Amino acid sequence: MSEQTRIQLGRVISSKMDKSIVVAIERMVKHPMYGKYIKRTTKLHAHDENNECNLGDTVEVRECRPLSKTKSWTLVRIVEKARV
């Protein structure tokens, strides 16, 4: 069997920690009763080895082994830099 690693695309909402970032993943979920689509956000803590991400960057992260209590994702690449 091939090993599947999860890859997510999200926006950096915090980069104040050393070698760590917080990435917000937004998704649309259909309300079970009313059928309206609602925006839901998941926050992931990811490892940024070179401290290259800034606030607002669009990044790609992938799942890895647990690196700390809350951090089990690592930065793959920066898709788009934030406009300043």
From Swiss-Prot:
<dbReference type="GO" id="GO:0019843">
    <property type="term" value="F:rRNA binding"/>
</dbReference>
<dbReference type="InterPro" id="IPR012340">
    <property type="entry name" value="NA-bd_OB-fold"/>
</dbReference>
<dbReference type="GO" id="GO:0006412">
    <property type="term" value="P:translation"/>
</dbReference>
<dbReference type="GO" id="GO:0022627">
    <property type="term" value="C:cytosolic small ribosomal subunit"/>
</dbReference>
<keyword id="KW-0694">RNA-binding</keyword>
<keyword id="KW-0699">rRNA-binding</keyword>
<dbReference type="GO" id="GO:0003735">
    <property type="term" value="F:structural constituent of ribosome"/>
</dbReference>
<protein>
    <recommendedName>
        <fullName>Small ribosomal subunit protein uS17</fullName>
    </recommendedName>
</protein>
<dbReference type="InterPro" id="IPR019984">
    <property type="entry name" value="Ribosomal_uS17_bact/chlr"/>
</dbReference>
<dbReference type="InterPro" id="IPR000266">
    <property type="entry name" value="Ribosomal_uS17"/>
</dbReference>
<dbReference type="InterPro" id="IPR019979">
    <property type="entry name" value="Ribosomal_uS17_CS"/>
</dbReference>
<comment type="subunit">
    <text>Part of the 30S ribosomal subunit.</text>
</comment>
<dbReference type="Pfam" id="PF00366">
    <property type="entry name" value="Ribosomal_S17"/>
</dbReference>
<keyword id="KW-0689">Ribosomal protein</keyword>
<keyword id="KW-0687">Ribonucleoprotein</keyword>
<comment type="function">
    <text>One of the primary rRNA binding proteins, it binds specifically to the 5'-end of 16S ribosomal RNA.</text>
</comment>
<comment type="similarity">
    <text>Belongs to the universal ribosomal protein uS17 family.</text>
</comment>
